């Protein structure tokens, strides 16, 4: 019997799991995918928003600004890369300058510190590659950039280190109400729990509708992106937005925490919750809009494009509440932007709801907030590199040439407490395959290392999601 079962191991589910691991509770984290953070969390703008865009009084307004200010300490504890580069919202005419004024006032009401409306001259002094056609900008000094999948993996690892039980590749097929709480039935097992926290993202409606007559609908909204090579990662110094619209915060141009340049997204409401394909129309749109923000946009340096889906509801706000007709069942749904930025504050909000329901929740005396990251060989000093290779010679063998990732780093990623089991899971943990050739050189070697370390055949290694097998068998045995 679990005290709390969390359904969904994206950034929200993992953040709540880590927060719950601070208490004397038996916690289950149940995820239908074969890795944490493998849906919405892995494909987004990777921005920690300051909090000026959300309407005051909404959960987004309350939790974004609060969550933003929690990232410095969290990322130090978890050894996750995070940079407060600041953000600029550009205005191109007098009407948009008025919009900046409204955003500024919203930010002040939401408790966002260090907001400034800047002149054109000041903006161009700060970042010369911004378009000369602007009239001014809203500068949010607390805006930041992060690796969302690394953050989520770190949260999961720290949660497991502190006693959380994680069950991957477990898709929930039914939930039954019981006297003790709930029985969660997956495609693999059954889990009894007193309380349920529904963090199922795009499928939070399906999970809610299993137990509640207050039906929910999640609308998938697709956003498409271009990722550019590190050689142009310093094209802009800040996260560059245009004025927001009803469809979202608009197309941005931003450096990434790893030194690339990211542009996007567009916003397209869909029916299909698996439609992660990109379209020529969508990609052309983000390029056209992004070119309005900056003087130059070297699209010839694009190394990949991708799409992500965010979970939208008609409420136009986060849904974080106990279901009216399902006691002890807490929905955390509709967590679209600024969900990543709000994640730490959302976890505290959910804990408060649980405390009101459960009454007695005691804190642990031995909670360990720290998680050691895998050493990044390329970032070490020469002395540190030599010392590491002396301890483990696999750190002296480069597997991914684009990102200078060693065999030692890949092996470490596989044997963590929430370890990599697929090629893309390795990529998300240590960036092997994230570079210019997008895994063209290193993927076969990563497959070989995964198979060796997991004790399976290379044909059993998947690229990412379940069933995405790469190899069918040795070629020599097939040729007659």
UniProtKB/Swiss-Prot annotation:
Its cofactor is [2Fe-2S] cluster. [2Fe-2S] cluster binds at residues 400, 402, 437, 442. It is an enzyme of class 1 (oxidoreductase). It catalyses: sn-glycerol 3-phosphate + A = dihydroxyacetone phosphate + AH2. Coiled coil: none annotated. GO terms for molecular function: (S)-2-hydroxy-acid oxidase activity; 2 iron, 2 sulfur cluster binding; metal ion binding. Pathway: Polyol metabolism; glycerol degradation via glycerol kinase pathway; glycerone phosphate from sn-glycerol 3-phosphate (aerobic route): step 1/1. FAD binds at residues 12, 31, 40-41, 45-47, 172, 335-336, 341. The active site is at residue 49. CDD domains: GlpA-like_Fer2_BFD-like. Its EC number is 1.1.99.-. Keywords: 2Fe-2S, FAD, Flavoprotein, Iron, Iron-sulfur, Metal-binding, Oxidoreductase. GO terms for biological process: glycerol catabolic process. Sn-glycerol 3-phosphate binds at residues 45, 49, 249, 310, 337. InterPro entries: BFD-like_2Fe2S-bd_dom (IPR007419), BFD-like_2Fe2S-bd_dom_sf (IPR041854), FAD-dep_OxRdtase (IPR006076), FAD/NAD-bd_sf (IPR036188), G3P_Oxidase/Oxidoreductase (IPR052745). Binds 1 [2Fe-2S] cluster. Pfam families: DAO, Fer2_BFD. PANTHER family: GLYCEROL 3-PHOSPHATE OXIDASE, GLYCEROL-3-PHOSPHATE DEHYDROGENASE. Catalyzes the dehydrogenation of glycerol 3-phosphate to dihydroxyacetone phosphate. Is probably involved in anaerobic glycerol metabolism. Active in vitro with the artificial electron acceptor 2,6-dichlorophenolindophenol (DCPIP), but not with NAD or NADP. Also displays a very low oxidase activity in vitro on glycerol 3-phosphate with O2 as the electron acceptor, but this activity is most likely not physiological. This is Glycerol 3-phosphate dehydrogenase. It comes from Caloramator mitchellensis. The lineage of its organism: Bacteria, Bacillati, Bacillota, Clostridia, Eubacteriales.
